[in-house]
Regions:
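Transmembrane alpha-helices and adjacent helix-loop boundaries
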Residues: 1-255
Length: 255
């Protein structure tokens, strides 16, 4: 590896690397957000109680079957294959010329949605059943219970998994180069094809990928800590209040 070549590649092709990194982040952010929304909707639908008989039971069974097929298909096939099928398949079957970036957003979104659906469903199931029973006792239906009681807890609980999906998407967008999306990997291939210094070019790409994933991971951990709040609490006057240092010391002395 030549350090001089790395410096030269960065100086001559810096804008291409930055443009590719921006497209990677753009697709990852939008794809993760849309995928999370898809996952929330599917998670809520799949946890609707199925009655023992009636038309509602038949409808829910059909809908759950379709959603399960969607989840299994996109979780069970590689994203690179999905990209080829959706982009080239839509053009061949329906004569639709999809914009490459839009196709990338669509692929990442529906792929993430399949994974997030199971994460959300698991988060909903993990909520204490007593909360569902209490909501039902005061006359709430399933969607009111989800909106007012369950989902606020679920969103907090699935935040780490959502962050992991975001980091995975940053790396997995590299497969979109097969449909010529100008993300970081695609731009790096172009740079390496021009100077024939593949190792040095992709070393620069590695550094950029690491900077993005490392930074995003630290930001997400900071957000999680902020949401968790302080570690020490005391109960006073039926109110949950943050304990001050002197309060903790005083209580320790009393004990």
């Amino acid at each position: 590896m030549s350090l001089d070549w790395i410096v030269r590649i960065v100086q001559e092709n810096g804008p291409m690397f930055l443009r590719g990194a921006w497209v990677t982040l753009y697709i990852s952010i939008i794809g993760t957000l849309v995928g999370t929304l898809i996952g929330l909707v599917i998670g809520v639908i799949k946890t609707i109680p199925v009655p023992e008989k009636g038309v509602k039971r038949i409808i829910l069974k059909i809908v759950n079957g379709i959603l399960s097929a969607y989840i299994e298909f996109f979780r069970g096939t590689p994203m690179i294959v999905q990209a080829m099928v959706i982009y080239y398949g839509s053009a061949a079957a329906f004569s639709i010329d999809i914009n490459k970036t839009f196709a990338g957003l669509l692929i990442v979104s529906i792929n993430t949605g399949a994974y997030m659906a199971e994460i959300v469903r698991g988060g909903i199931i993990s909520v204490d059943k007593g909360q569902f029973e209490a909501a039902q006792a005061i006359g709430m239906n399933h969607f009111q219970t989800m909106r007012n009681i369950v989902l606020p807890q679920v969103v907090r609980n699935i935040l780490p998994a959502t962050g992991n999906e975001f980091v995975i998407n940053i790396k997995d967008t590299s497969v979109l180069n097969v449909i010529a999306v100008s993300e970081l990997f695609f731009q790096t291939k172009s740079v390496a094809g021009n100077n024939f210094r593949y190792f040095e070019s992709f070393f620069v790409a590695c550094i950029l990928y690491f900077i993005m994933t490392f930074t995003i991971t630290r930001i997400l951990r900071f957000i999680e800590k902020k949401i968790d709040g302080p570690e020490n609490y005391i109960i006073a006057g039926n109110q949950m209040q943050v304990a001050r240092a002197e309060d903790i010391v005083r209580k320790a002395k009393e004990v």
